[in-house]
A protein has these predicted regions:
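Acidic, low-complexity terminal tails and accessory targeting/binding regions
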Residues: 1-30, 103-140, 180-186, 199-254
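A short, acidic, amphipathic alpha-helical segment used as a generic capping/interface helix at domain edges
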Residues: 167-183
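Extended, charge-rich low-complexity interaction segments
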Residues: 136-163, 249-254
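Active-site-proximal alpha-helix that buttresses catalytic centers in soluble enzyme cores
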Residues: 1-111, 157-164, 168, 214-222
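Generic beta-sheet signal
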Residues: 77, 183-195
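Alpha-helical recognition domains of nuclear gene-regulatory proteins
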Residues: 52, 93, 174-177, 200-203
Length: 254
């Protein structure tokens, strides 16, 4: 307990000081408590993903080649991200080469459905609802400004998760969206958060199927490919399931 208090109090003091700094310097849209930006460690991890996506495909398996071609934009796919800044920045840095190609209709679609499953303040977005332009956080590298301003799409963003929402509702809503006309491409590349993804695997993998993704968190910048299946029930509702055989760890892992 003493160790926790010793570590906790300086962090609180630093956070309050940063909030005051943002206020007096006219950066009221910034925050240290809420929607924490990408850290230096997170930036390095995202750069690691960017380097991986720039590697030759010569020594990859056929399945890995197929998935990486989707990631780099050689095969049709849609980029989507949580509405939290650290997820958006991770995707923007990791996929910078693809986004800088200026492929037609290629942008990061911001989704409330991918918002982290947590009550912590840093899991609350400070982004406004649909139609807003994104700005760099104070920790973001300058080159992200163009991507955030011109290669993001907030038309489907619904703001912060509602009070009556929960993790399962957002998981289901995301699956519904993947199969909807709003995301018309067959492949979807999602940037999100560790608890959200672990819950996703726990919910949609068969109950009896043992896999590390149900117990461990996906590391920041990690990439895993899978096939999400949809089945219509007799009642007319949809159920979703991850094909266990389709899970392919491409980078980072759990």
């Amino acid at each position: 307990m003493a160790q926790f208090i010793i570590n906790f109090i300086p962090g609180i003091i630093k956070s309050i000081a940063m909030e005051g700094y943002f206020f007096v310097t006219g950066q009221a849209q910034e925050s240290w408590f809420y929607d924490s930006p990408l850290s230096k460690k997170g930036l390095n991890q995202a750069e690691g993903l960017a380097s991986f996506l720039g590697e030759s495909l010569d020594y990859k398996t056929p399945k890995e080649q197929e998935l990486i071609k989707i990631l780099i934009g050689d095969s049709p796919s849609q980029l989507v991200s949580s509405n939290l800044r650290r997820a958006i920045s991770t995707m923007a840095v990791g996929f910078q080469a693809r986004l800088n190609k200026n492929l037609q209709n290629d942008s990061i679609v911001i989704l409330s459905e991918l918002q982290e499953i947590s009550r912590n303040p840093d899991a609350l977005t400070i982004l406004t609802t649909k139609g807003s332009k994104l700005q760099c956080a104070w920790t973001d590298p300058p080159f992200l400004e163009h991507i955030l301003m011109h290669r993001t799409d907030t038309s489907l963003h619904q703001g912060n998760k509602p009070i009556d929402s929960n993790g399962f509702k957002r998981l289901q809503a995301f699956c519904d969206l993947v199969f909807s006309d709003n995301l018309k491409k067959d492949a979807v590349i999602a940037a999100g958060h560790s608890l959200w993804f672990r819950s996703f695997f726990q919910t949609y993998l068969p109950y009896s199927f043992e896999h590390i993704s149900k117990k461990k968190k996906l590391i920041n910048g990690g990439c895993v490919g899978l096939v999400l299946q949809r089945v219509k029930t007799k009642e007319g509702t949809f159920k979703y399931m991850i094909d266990p055989k389709s899970i392919t760890v491409l980078y980072g892992g759990f």
